[in-house]
From Swiss-Prot:
Gene3D superfamilies registered for this protein in UniProt: N-(1-d-carboxylethyl)-l-norvaline Dehydrogenase, domain 2 (1.10.1040.10), NAD(P)-binding Rossmann-like Domain (3.40.50.720)
GO molecular function, one term: NAD+ binding
Protein known as: Hydroxyacyl-coenzyme A dehydrogenase, mitochondrial
Site entry: Important for catalytic activity: 170
Naturally occurring in which organism (per UniProt): Sus scrofa
Subunit and interaction comment: Homodimer. Interacts with GLUD1; this interaction inhibits the activation of glutamate dehydrogenase 1 (GLUD1).
Length: 314
């Protein structure tokens, strides 16, 4: 009798999970974990397009800083969007801000959300532990998504019991301005989950593209090897960094040269990505670390944010 009861419970649980994954979700309520630049940007665009948002971080001070940054960003948007009607711009800012609440307790706010978007530190263990904990409190239908740019989505999904309702949702910086969103599907991501995230991205005014869970997805898989190859040209003495930048801007039509872009993104960020890929596939020639970049990072010369990278900034 006890065995039969356990089997029935398992069957009902399995049926419930299958039903949740088979159903397309209209995302109205969004929980964003991480109040940094990316998380705040995601919260801003979600709230500005009619979604109810809860922004979560570790302390009230961080959240206050995040909301202040969101307000400043919104006022810039309003100034341009409502140039002829400042009053309407003020109303837009206030309405958007009123749609964003904050919390320092993620577990207490995910029970009724439709979508959880994680945008915290790029650390597999930290992210996995977060998702494992939230999985116990989130509703059955809730979709989990990570904004990671370098970690494997499948590894994060495996920390939960909702692998079919788990995907990558990779925004680009600055989120309010950049139109692209990469929707990353693992082998377990259901078609309905994928469709739900594509639809959600469109409601944000973004252009979603879908891809498999491979290193770098689409943009970084093409961009990072290009940047590293530019550094190798420089390391070999084939050309100066200034001439390489000029060549790519004037010859390829790129708005920034590779060294300018590396300094803008952050050499520490690029090193983190390439090191992670190298760890996954050390034989891939595209994933080989750069001695010149490693040296700069070791000297805490990360680019524009530290005042010096490949170039010096005043």
């Amino acid at each position: 009798m006890a065995f039969a009861t356990r089997q029935l419970v398992r069957s009902l649980s399995s049926s419930s999970t299958a039903a949740a994954s088979a159903k397309k979700i209209l995302v109205k309520h969004v929980t964003v974990i991480g109040g940094g630049l990316m998380g705040a940007g995601i919260a801003q665009v979600a709230a500005a397009t009619g979604h109810t948002v809860v922004l979560v971080d570790q302390t009230e001070d961080i959240l206050a800083k995040s909301k202040k940054g969101i307000e400043e960003s919104l006022r810039k948007v309003a100034k341009k969007k409502f140039a002829e009607n400042p009053k309407a711009g003020d109303e837009f800012v206030e309405k958007t801000l009123s749609s964003i609440s904050t919390s320092t307790d993620a577990a207490s706010v995910v029970h009724s959300t439709d979508l959880v978007v994680e945008a915290i530190v790029e650390n597999l263990k930290v992210k996995s532990e977060l998702f494992k904990r939230l999985d116990k409190f989130a509703a059955e239908h809730t979709i989990f998504a990570s904004n990671t740019s370098s970690l494997q989505i499948t590894s994060l999904a495996n920390a939960t019991t909702r692998q079919d309702r788990f995907a990558g949702l990779h925004f680009f910086n600055p989120v309010p301005l950049m139109k692209l969103v990469e929707v990353v599907k693992t082998p377990m991501t259901s078609q309905k989950t994928l469709e739900s995230l594509v639809d959600f991205s469109k409601t944000l005014g973004k252009h979603p593209v879908s891809c498999k869970d491979t290193p770098g997805f689409i943009v970084n898989r093409l961009l990072v090897p290009y940047l590293i190859e530019a550094v190798r040209l420089y390391e070999r003495g084939d050309a100066s960094k200034e001439d390489i930048d000029t060549a790519m801007k004037l010859g390829a039509g790129y708005p920034m040269g590779p060294f300018e872009l590396l300094d803008y993104v952050g050499l520490d960020t690029t090193k983190f990505i390439i090191d992670g890929w190298h760890e996954m596939d050390s034989q891939n020639p595209l994933f080989q670390p750069s001695p010149a970049m490693n040296k700069l990072v070791a000297e805490n010369k990360f680019g524009k944010k530290t005042g010096e990278g490949f170039y010096k900034y005043k």
